[in-house]
């Protein structure tokens, strides 16, 4: 199948059930007609102008998106209702069609992004070197502020734990202790990444990010297990807490202040894209939840029933284990070489084909996680009689374009003169 057809075949065959697409290719122009059956009626939607009303297009080796457009009605209504209410009020088939077109809109946006790289020679929105330095400085500031605040709040919560002797408050305090330990782990990771060593780490230290986060999350999940066991022991022993009014006021004041500070830090750290700073944001959000539960259960245990306090500690422990176990799984996936989603591979294919007229075939397009970003491997076929200098320049400029994408850490472009050979790499 010609590559022109392949790109849009991938683009169009993600349609919902009971939807049929006919594809016709005319030079570099691709026509697609959709037939959707809804409530017994059949109608036609032309995603591209028909031959009669379309302006003539010049023959070109490039994939052209100028004539492509989605229908004005995408099968879904956007009348301001919440997504939750639309889910129950909108017929299932209409929801599927609407979701399908939203996916196509996102894919078109990705293709337009690739077009921008072809036209301008660089990706839009890529920060300059000066902007990158300022961003790195602000990220380091966010890490230092978080660590210093965690130290101060830990001291305050130790006092609250001593005054209240609440298991839920103690669980929250132990969480703050581990915040300091985990903060040191993340700081060490970020600091190590800023010191490149081309001899020991020839492709950089970016994989230290997910490794540091996995260690961080593992320690937090271990804390949750310990608190769970201790709270269960208290429930079996039927041991409650006792506080006078002064101790209760001190505990409430400290825990409320800590929760407010953590909430503000969470909002601050969420504004960054760096994975380590966002891990701090997740930790601050976790502290807001655990502090709120710890305070509420401690006060309720004093006012009403003793068992509310260890029950609250168990809830905190379960939340801790679930949250950080999910974080571990997410970062493990980024280290094991998981393939990029089909939409991203389609963007890469579009970029590669439009790179140069002499590219006759695209043999391989592969992208997989290797840390927080993707490694990309591309095999392209050039004319066998092409000069080495010209072939090298085509491959090198394509590599530079691929590495401009924010999701790509490193790209490898392999040049060949035919595509009927056996696999060139060992597959385990």
Curated annotation (Swiss-Prot):
Keywords: Ion transport, Membrane, Transmembrane, Transmembrane helix, Transport, Vacuole
Ranges of the Vacuolar topological domain: 162-167, 231-248, 309-311
Bilayer disposition of the protein: Multi-pass membrane protein
Single annotated GO MF: monoatomic cation transmembrane transporter activity
One cellular component (GO) term of this entry: vacuolar membrane
Compartments reported by the entry: Vacuole membrane
Family: Belongs to the cation diffusion facilitator (CDF) transporter (TC 2.A.4) family. SLC30A subfamily.
Function field: Involved in sequestration of excess metal in the cytoplasm into vacuoles to maintain metal homeostasis.
PANTHER family with a match to the protein in the record: METAL TOLERANCE PROTEIN 10, MITOCHONDRIAL METAL TRANSPORTER 1-RELATED
The protein, known as: Metal tolerance protein 10
The species this protein was found in: Arabidopsis thaliana (Mouse-ear cress)
Gene behind the chain: MTP10
């Amino acid at each position: 199948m010609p590559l022109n057809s392949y790109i849009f075949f991938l683009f169009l065959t993600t349609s919902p059930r009971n939807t049929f697409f006919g594809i016709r290719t005319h030079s570099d122009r691709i026509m697609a007609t959709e037939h959707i059956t809804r409530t017994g009626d059949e109608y036609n939607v032309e995603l591209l102008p028909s031959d009669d009303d379309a302006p003539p297009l010049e023959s070109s080796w490039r994939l052209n998106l100028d004539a492509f457009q989605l229908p004005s009605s995408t099968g879904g209504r956007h009348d301001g209702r919440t997504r939750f209410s639309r889910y129950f009020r909108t017929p299932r088939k209409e929801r599927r069609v609407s979701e399908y077109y939203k996916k196509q809109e996102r894919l078109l946006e990705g293709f337009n992004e690739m077009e921008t790289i072809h036209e301008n020679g660089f990706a839009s929105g890529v920060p300059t070197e000066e902007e990158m330095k300022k961003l790195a400085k602000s990220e380091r500031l966010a890490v230092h502020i978080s660590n210093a605040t965690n130290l101060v709040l830990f001291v305050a919560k130790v006092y609250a734990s001593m005054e209240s002797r609440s298991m839920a408050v103690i669980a929250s305090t132990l969480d703050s202790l581990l915040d300091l330990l985990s903060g040191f782990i993340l700081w060490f990771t970020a600091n190590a990444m800023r010191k490149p060593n081309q001899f020991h780490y020839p492709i950089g230290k970016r994989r230290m990010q997910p490794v540091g986060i996995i260690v961080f999350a593992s320690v937090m999940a271990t804390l949750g297990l310990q608190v769970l066991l201790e709270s269960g022991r208290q429930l079996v022993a039927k041991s409650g807490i006792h506080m006078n009014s002064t101790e209760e006021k001190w505990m409430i004041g400290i825990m409320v202040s800590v929760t407010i500070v953590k909430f503000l830090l969470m909002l601050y750290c969420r504004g960054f894209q760096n994975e380590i700073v966002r891990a701090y944001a997740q930790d601050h959000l976790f502290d807001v939840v655990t502090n709120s539960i710890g305070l509420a259960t401690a006060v309720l245990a004093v006012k009403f029933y003793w068992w509310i306090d260890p029950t609250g500690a168990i809830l905190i422990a379960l939340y801790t284990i679930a949250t950080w176990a999910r974080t571990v799984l997410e970062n493990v996936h980024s280290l094991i070489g998981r393939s990029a989603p089909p939409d991203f591979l389609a963007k890469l294919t579009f970029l590669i084909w439009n790179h140069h007229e002499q590219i006759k075939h695209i043999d391989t397009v592969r992208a997989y996680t290797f840390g927080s970003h993707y490694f990309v491997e591309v095999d392209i076929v050039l004319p066998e009689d092409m000069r080495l200098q010209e072939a090298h320049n085509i491959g090198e400029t394509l590599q530079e374009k691929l590495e401009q994408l924010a999701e790509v850490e490193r790209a490898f472009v392999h040049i060949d003169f035919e595509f009927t050979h056996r696999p060139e790499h060992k597959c385990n």
